[in-house]
Amino acid sequence: MKITVPATSANIGPGFDSVGVAVSKYLTIEVLEPADVWFIEHDLGDIPSDENNLLISTALQVKSDLQPHKLVMTSDIPLARGLGSSSSVIVAGIELANQLADLKLSDDDKLDIATKIEGHPDNVAPAIFGNLVVASYVDEHVNSIVTEFPECAFVAFIPSYELKTSESRGALPSDLSYKDAVAASSIANVAIAALFAGDLVKAGRAIQGDMFHERYRQKLVKEFATIKELSGQYGAYATYLSGAGPTVMTLTPNDQAEALKTAIDGLGLDGETLILSVDKGGVVVD
């Protein structure tokens, strides 16, 4: 059995802690034979290979008496870069328990569990459903809507350094004035409505008008302003911080993606530029 979970790009500007899209980088878990103890074969560096791994600890939160197995974990989702690496593992852990214990969890069940573990739905929801997901988590209740993302390319600049979510959250203010909250909410409303309507020009304008988090976090990602300015010269719809950063994501017409990638590479920044697409499948079991 093989479990595959996509990477995710959350927030998308003003959709803070609420909006995310699944993209074409993947975590794969291959389930091998039963064993006396859990063992995960991987080449992902200094992460546990036993039940202390987030994958297994998540699965055991769902079903505490699972039969241990040998597993193989592979992933091309970079760690601590704002592409949902931990969320993909949480979703995979829930699916692992679902399959091994035949729990018959619905996607909504999985989202409820994942959100309680993660604390917000913006990454775990698209990892489960695929596509674009808008979700809320209030009073321990998750409400979500899934739709297709308008046709475009995602040009991701992934810096060589990590940025922990806790550090990125530390840059945020403790509150907003009522006036700013109303303005920020109206911008988010337009961004979501435009994405649902397929109008990437208006969506892009609203995405770049975010008032919730990007203005505070940009100083932690020194490449952001340079890439945003350059992307505008190539007709991009919007540039935003993916999740908590440091990945800088640009939405661009498909026919401009390669040219923009080449231009970003030409800046000589310390990192990698990739062209990604929307993943429409979410978590998949083969």
Swiss-Prot record:
The pathway entry for this protein reads as:
Amino-acid biosynthesis; L-threonine biosynthesis; L-threonine from L-aspartate: step 4/5
What's its EC? 2.7.1.39
Q: Where in the cell is it found?
A: Cytoplasm
GO CC list: cytoplasm
* Any one GO molecular-function label of the UniProt entry: homoserine kinase activity
Kindly state which reaction or reactions the protein catalyses: L-homoserine + ATP = O-phospho-L-homoserine + ADP + H(+)
What does this chain do? Catalyzes the ATP-dependent phosphorylation of L-homoserine to L-homoserine phosphate.
Q: Which HAMAP family match?
A: Homoser_kinase (MF_00384)
This chain belongs to which protein, by name? Homoserine kinase
Please report the organism this UniProt entry assigns to the protein: Streptococcus thermophilus (strain ATCC BAA-491 / LMD-9)
